[in-house]
Amino acid sequence: MAVAAGGLLKYSTQTDFSGGYLTQAIANGLGINVRRAEELKRRRGLLGSGGEYEVSTLMLPYLDVILGEARRVKNLYEKNYREKIERIILAGGGANLLGVEKYVAEEFRLPALKASPFTKIGHLPLIAPFTGNLGAPLAVSLGLGMRRTN
């Protein structure tokens, strides 16, 4: 988890929780293998209804733990730097979870959007159809690749 302002990293920390925990919760809750659970997570996300609702209810406790960590980082940053966080940018594979932007925005009462690093870097038109889904998972890698060393 990181806080940036003016294009500079101001605060960062690590969490042990990730989208893999959401997948494992589905696998354990439904008694299915992890591959099938990952498929259900990607296809249904937090938007499931009817019989699909169970998938989102299995993930929410783990997602709420991740958001609790993010809330702790937000509060700590705002207290120490006396600056308000204005929006949340979701990165990593979990940022592609259907409905996660809306859920995070509602939980934090802040705009939440998926990282889209390809808007800031040049790329071949050939990969344009893939940048929407690959941007968030690759955001950290792309950022590190662009970092200049002294």
Label each PLM-derived region with a short phrase.
Residues 1-150:
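Hydrophobic/aromatic-enriched cytosolic interaction surfaces used to assemble or bind macromolecules
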